[in-house]
Design a protein with these regions (language model features):
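Charge-rich, well-structured scaffold segments of protease-associated domains
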Residues: 1-121, 154-155, 185-329
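His/Glu-based metal-binding/catalytic segments typifying zinc-dependent metallopeptidases
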Residues: 88, 117-180
């Protein structure tokens, strides 16, 4: 099975050869997926177009139908040679893999006929003038149902990566996260919830989104502000949350898929303190409560904040929301 997996993996580096009929069929499937997902009408697309304006990550990964129409087999192969080059690829293996398996993988990779160049890509994004200087504005996209997305700009060079990850986990990510737990479990006023920490070497954005009844929009903003200010004041159980987060990371030792992502992404792609599972605190989590409080004070400010609401424009009191958000500063 491992040998078969090697063949599939190394096949990614082969020249793409398709008939015009097969290529057009594949393009048709991709365009159908784009239309079906209709991401351009989503709150997430609207939010990202504000946060990442004029940057490389403003556009959706899947692309647009008009872009797909311009793609050719020749263009794909040119891009493949540039991206799948020796200077831009690495292989990270986790799980029940023997030395014999690794030797076979190394041998197969060494035989690949790929470019030895490095395309010079960096894991950074262009920062627009609004980053860290956000306009005090509630961005509204008209809709019948009401959804809210709130995000904060992050300077990824200011604190070690473990500080941001723990702050994100503490407040927004997972069943025990303070914001999620309070809004959804302890005092349920939202219907759905999602969170993201979009992170690059220079900047990032911590954001979370949810659906809410239109009559509770102002209440939910008051609650969010109270929770963020509590984090800035240190009113949270740091030790319990640290232990819970480290317990989750320990579970990844039994999950080769998650472990592979963590080791490859944090140790080789992001410029953060590497993960060392032999270390009591995994290196990255030698974090103090004071660091979390300091980071919270720096991040959760109006100048870093983007608020996008999808709902009935006539029923949303933007001035009242803005008045509530003043308490963050």
């Amino acid at each position: 099975e491992f040998d078969f997996a090697i063949e599939i993996l190394c096949g990614l580096f082969d020249e793409i050869k398709l008939t015009s009929h097969d290529f057009n069929n594949e393009k048709g499937r991709i365009k159908a997926e784009i239309r079906e997902k209709d991401r351009r009408s989503s709150l997430d697309f609207y939010f990202n177009s504000i946060v990442w304006k004029n940057s490389e990550v403003e556009k959706i990964v899947l692309g647009y139908c008009k872009t797909i129409d311009r793609v050719s087999v020749k263009k794909i192969n040119e891009f493949r040679q540039k991206v799948l080059s020796a200077g831009n690829c690495f292989v990270y293996a986790t799980g029940n893999i023997s030395d014999k398996n690794l030797d076979a993988l190394n041998k197969k990779i060494s035989e690949l006929d790929i470019s030895q160049s490095n395309p010079g890509f960096t894991n950074t994004v262009t920062v627009n003038n609004e980053f860290f200087h956000r306009e005090k504005k509630i961005w509204i996209k008209n809709n019948y149902w009401h959804y809210i997305q709130i995000g904060f700009d992050v300077d990824c060079s200011k604190y070690p990566g473990g500080v941001y990850d723990l702050l994100y986990a503490l407040l927004f990510n997972g069943d025990k996260a303070l914001v999620y737990n309070y809004l959804s479990e302890d005092n349920p006023i939202i219907y759905s919830y999602d969170s993201t920490f979009e992170q690059y070497d220079n900047v990032g954005n911590i954001n979370f989104s949810f659906e809410v009844d239109r009559n509770k929009i102002e209440d939910v903003f008051k609650t969010v502000v109270e929770l963020l200010n509590a984090a800035k004041d240190g009113r949270f159980n740091f030790e319990a949350n640290l232990n819970y987060e480290m317990f989750n990371w320990e579970l990844d030792l039994d999950n080769p898929d998650n472990l592979n992502w963590n080791m490859a992404y944090y140790n080789h792609i992001l410029k953060t303190q590497p993960i060392d599972y032999s270390d009591e605190f995994y290196g990255r989590f030698r974090v103090t409560k004071e660091q979390i409080i300091d980071a919270a004070k720096y991040i959760f400010r109006r100048c870093n904040m983007t608020v996008a609401v999808k709902g009935d424009r006539k029923k949303i009191n933007a001035e009242a929301i803005e008045k509530i958000l003043e308490s963050l500063d």
